[in-house]
Design a protein with these regions (language model features):
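N-terminal helical cap/lid subdomain that shapes the substrate entry/recognition surface
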Residues: 1-114
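Asp-based, Mg2+/Mn2+-dependent phosphohydrolase catalytic module
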Residues: 1-5, 15-17, 36-44, 113, ...
């Protein structure tokens, strides 16, 4: 029978409804730090540089199967601007970027807190999340502030381990921590490449959650496709134990 369920973080547990506001604040923080160093840049240059940071992250994420930490993303942004920063200013800006998600937080997917509490009565739960600007230690705080930390027995954040989804080792490591076999577990996530294909490659069932991000819905290979979080208890209850 199904014994464990793992969850992605972004667009599965939380929706980044204020992502654009956070991006604008990030640009302002960068501009302020550069101004303090007597460097001025145009708004267009800032926007292009921040886009270069995202592009750098995506290249590393896809090609190296790791998620570069905030320090590396900032280096890519500064390189796009053709400049560098003294170590003290660099460290200060990294910290501000990392913590920005606490000042401008995402919102829980509707129904998620109550559903997680219910699922924790039946299954062992874990989070498996790739990280970007915000490291695992900060995302733990996001979970805690929304009363969503307690249901989880284990949390895997890519910045703390090096490897990221879809590497099957990420899923297997988490299941080892939970003490269950891959056929006894299902992963819930929104991205076909990382969540669905990654979990299935590790021998797990995959539940493709499209309630917050449905970009991959048409090409999903998920064992189940779920649009509303409240559907999960019944859907998981009817999911056969893969290979049991």
């Amino acid at each position: 029978m199904l014994r464990a369920v793992t969850f992605d973080f972004w667009n599965t547990l939380f929706v980044d409804v204020h992502g654009r506001d956070r991006e604008q604040r990030r640009a302002q923080l960068l501009a302020d730090e550069l101004a303090a160093l007597d460097m001025t840049v145009t708004d267009a240059a800032l926007e292009d540089a921040l886009e270069s940071g995202f592009a750098f992250f995506d290249r590393v994420w896809v090609n190296e199967q790791r998620t570069p930490p905030c320090e590396e993303i900032l280096d890519a942004i500064l390189a796009a601007l053709g400049t560098t920063m003294p170590p003290e200013a660099h460290a200060r800006l990294v910290e501000r970027f990392e913590l920005l998600v606490l000042d401008i937080p995402p919102e829980p997917v509707p129904g998620a807190p109550a559903v997680l509490d219910a699922l924790a009565q039946r299954y062992r739960l874990a989070v498996i999340s790739d990280t970007g600007y915000s490291p695992g230690r900060v995302l733990r705080t996001v979970l805690e502030r929304n009363a969503m930390l307690a249901p989880f027995e284990y949390l895997y954040f890519s910045d703390e381990h090096g490897a990221c989804k879809p590497d099957p080792r990420v899923f297997r490591h988490t299941l080892d921590e939970l003490g269950v076999r891959a056929p006894e577990a299902a992963h819930v996530g929104d991205i076909q490449r990382t969540d669905v294909a990654g979990a299935q490659a590790a021998g797990m069932s995959a539940v493709h959650f499209i309630g917050a991000n449905n970009h991959d819905a048409a090409r999903s290979t998920g064992d189940l496709v779920v649009r509303h979080f409240e559907e999960l208890p019944a859907a998981l209850g009817g999911l056969p134990c893969a290979g049991c």
